[in-house]
Amino acid sequence: MKNICILGATGSIGTQTLDVIEKESNKFKLVAFSANKSYEKIITIIEKFNPVYGAINDKETFLKVKDHCNINNIKINLLYGMDGLIKISTLEEVELVVTSIVGMIGLVPTLEAINAGKDIALANKETLVTGGELVMKAAKQNNVKILPVDSEHGAIFQCLQGNSYKDIETIYVTASGGPFRQSKLEELINITPEQALKHPKWNMGKKISIDSSTMINKGLEVIEAHWLFNVGYDKIKVLVHPQSIVHSMVEYIDGSIIAQLASTDMRLPIQYALNYPVRNKKVVEKLDVYNMGNLTFEKPDFEKFRGLKLAYEAGKLGGIMPTIFNASNEVAVNMFLNNHIKYLEIVDIVEECMNKFENKSIKDVEDILNAEAKVRSFIKNKYNF
């Protein structure tokens, strides 16, 4: 029985991780989880999985859940805020921490978990995008496995099994192209949040859905792949694949290309990460290779999707520039979802911040958090958000 902690248990990845744990309850036990404001989901998790610990980031929700547990005589150790996140991430009994929490808030507890010797099933892109150098160094020092949960990185990870990283010629990170793959740039001027949230293939949370529509999500994945697989940016290419059946490919120096194909269900890469290094019987509908139809591939449009181009620039510059890229995008996406800016202004704001702030090297987590705070403050003050 493997003891699991999920950071961000009520979100899209967290919910699907719980589904895998439920289906394989003879192998996994939810010992601890974190959540923010989703009261009903939190209560369901507590009553269904009987975890020992729960960390809640929103004060009002924390008090409400605490009252419910006291009234109903439910035994659980409830914790609040960042201290709670760190506590559950470093529990002695926890063996694997699933970091599915969205945003920069996941960086510190993930690092703390690594320093406590916990293996990580990583679904929080921001952790590697902003702190990749610190995270991978800590993982090496503590002999910790970083197991990718993203479908693309999970696919790359599988394609690399039994092969040497030094033999990699090119990593192809596939992308569906999002809802606006066939749209012209001028057609994107008046895009609404509702339109941008309609992803053609994946069922995801709001933030990642908007990021997918701008292809900034793919840019974040490129930076993530750089750190996960220790590969230069010149060897990481984005390949638009509208059918979303090939989840990524690795080309080797001898010309061989290994690809991972599967149905579009996040529970598959989650299951692989939880069970690694073994495989278990499927928890998802298998891919019908006889009826999957034609598979097409095309180059991304870097002019229409400038966010992808900026991601490569930020990644190559290194230092705190990926943090500036990520933080500005987080705030801009939130502004767009609240109808405070237009769709194309998301990338404009990201570019503005990358040009405004000086790049610096990273010595510790504080450098990352300070850079993020400055970017957020600048945008909110300038755009009255």
UniProtKB/Swiss-Prot annotation:
Keywords on record: Isoprene biosynthesis, Manganese, Metal-binding, NADP, Oxidoreductase
Enzyme class: oxidoreductase
Keyword NADP: yes
SUPFAM superfamilies assigned: 1-deoxy-D-xylulose-5-phosphate reductoisomerase, C-terminal domain (SSF69055), Glyceraldehyde-3-phosphate dehydrogenase-like, C-terminal domain (SSF55347), NAD(P)-binding Rossmann-fold domains (SSF51735)
Residue ranges of coiled coil: none
A GO molecular function held by the record: 1-deoxy-D-xylulose-5-phosphate reductoisomerase activity
Any one Pfam family match given in the protein's UniProt record, by short name: DXP_redisom_C
Cofactor(s) needed: Mg(2+); Mn(2+)
Binding site residues for NADPH: 10-13, 37, 124, 126, 205
One GO BP: isopentenyl diphosphate biosynthetic process, methylerythritol 4-phosphate pathway involved in terpenoid biosynthetic process
Annotated positions binding Mn(2+): 150, 152, 221
Source taxon at top rank: Bacteria
Pathway: Isoprenoid biosynthesis; isopentenyl diphosphate biosynthesis via DXP pathway; isopentenyl diphosphate from 1-deoxy-D-xylulose 5-phosphate: step 1/6
Reactions performed catalytically: 2-C-methyl-D-erythritol 4-phosphate + NADP(+) = 1-deoxy-D-xylulose 5-phosphate + NADPH + H(+)
Entry EC no(s): 1.1.1.267
Entry keyword Protein transport: no
Family stated for the protein in its record: Belongs to the DXR family.
Alphabetical list of HAMAP family matching this protein: DXP_reductoisom
Annotated function: Catalyzes the NADPH-dependent rearrangement and reduction of 1-deoxy-D-xylulose-5-phosphate (DXP) to 2-C-methyl-D-erythritol 4-phosphate (MEP).
Protein name per its UniProtKB record: 1-deoxy-D-xylulose 5-phosphate reductoisomerase
Organism: Clostridium novyi (strain NT)
Gene behind this protein: dxr
